[in-house]
UniProtKB/Swiss-Prot annotation:
Top enzyme category: oxidoreductase
Organism from which the protein derives: Burkholderia multivorans (strain ATCC 17616 / 249)
Molecular function in Gene Ontology: 4-hydroxy-tetrahydrodipicolinate reductase; NAD binding; NADP binding; oxidoreductase activity, acting on CH or CH2 groups, NAD or NADP as acceptor
UniProt binding sites for NAD(+): G7, A8, S9, G10, R11, M12, D33, G96, T97, T98, A120, A121, N122, M123
This protein's name: 4-hydroxy-tetrahydrodipicolinate reductase
The entry's keywords: Amino-acid biosynthesis, Cytoplasm, Diaminopimelate biosynthesis, Lysine biosynthesis, NAD, NADP, Oxidoreductase
Pathway, per record: Amino-acid biosynthesis; L-lysine biosynthesis via DAP pathway; (S)-tetrahydrodipicolinate from L-aspartate: step 4/4
Localization in the cell: Cytoplasm
Gene: dapB
């Protein structure tokens, strides 16, 4: 599996590089970084004390010419540039980027008609199993329970609520036969009045080096149920991304998520 990594000098990029280097079936063939990054020209394995022979570069086409797969956990604007390159070079994509607008997501859907893409806000096995638990719980706590989603991440995260929190909200709303767009409440401030029981609330915490904590609260009268997933390391995301690469090896086109990769549909 000839794999290139986007955002190679970042926290997630480095975790992905390490995972690829430790996988006997994978070969690191490219490492993309943003233009102007001080890491450009460095060996991709320098942070591990390894000489991989792969240098960090901002030459998108040069990297795509070497790769069969690109793993991308960057930002929407960068990811869309990589999608264009994937179409030019027929490279399959594993995308963990969050913060896309509806219009940007439409670009991914269109691209998937020509190349195979796994697009998931969270690629950990635990989170994706949690989504199934939430669907089950929502069906049984549909009446008399208020639903709130609380997420916490490190101080550097730029979007809120997190993509994972939105995935959880969509899982719950879907199980209840609702559209998240119609029932989500993002944060509360001032005099808000009584809570509308049909809503799903979101709260976001940012601080320190929190990798990712997510809790879905079903609050009833006399009891509350909390379903929580906590990430202590990004390694689970990296391992999930490699599972997604293996899944794509048997696909030529189509847009998939981790529920497809893990056979949870």
């Amino acid at each position: 599996m000839k794999i290139a990594i986007a955002g190679a000098s970042g926290r997630m990029g480095r975790m992905l590089i390490e995972a690829v280097l430790n996988d006997a079936d994978a070969q690191l063939v490219g490492a993309l970084d943003r233009a102007g990054s001080p890491s450009l020209g460095q060996d991709a394995g320098a942070f591990l004390g390894k000489d991989t022979g792969v240098k960090l570069t901002d030459d998108i086409d040069a990297v795509f010419a070497q790769a069969d797969y690109l793993i991308d956990f960057t930002r929407p604007e960068g990811t869309l540039a990589h999608v264009e390159a994937a179409l030019r070079h027929d490279v399959k994509l594993v995308i963990g980027t969050t913060g896309f607008t509806a219009e940007q997501k439409a670009v991914l859907h269109a691209a998937a008609e020509k190349v195979a893409i796994v697009f998931a806000a969270n690629m950990s096995v635990g989170v994706n199993v949690t989504l199934k638990l939430l669907e089950f719980a929502a069906k049984h706590f549909s009446h008399g329970y208020d639903i709130e989603i609380i997420e916490a991440h490190h101080r550097h995260k730029v979007d809120a609520p997190s993509g994972t929190a939105l995935m959880m909200g969509e899982a719950v709303a879907g199980a209840l036969g609702r559209s998240l767009d119609d029932c989500a409440v993002y944060g509360r401030h001032g005099v808000t009045g009584e809570r509308d029981p049909s809503t799903i609330g979101f709260a976001a915490v940012r601080g320190g080096d929190i990798v990712g904590d997510h809790t879905v609260l079903f609050a009833g009268i006399g009891e509350r149920i909390e379903i929580t997933h906590k990430s202590s390391s990004r390694v689970s995301y990296a391992q999930g991304a490699l599972r997604a690469v293996r899944f794509l090896s048997a696909r030529d086109t189509g847009l998939f998520d981790m529920q497809d990769v893990l056979g949870l549909r």
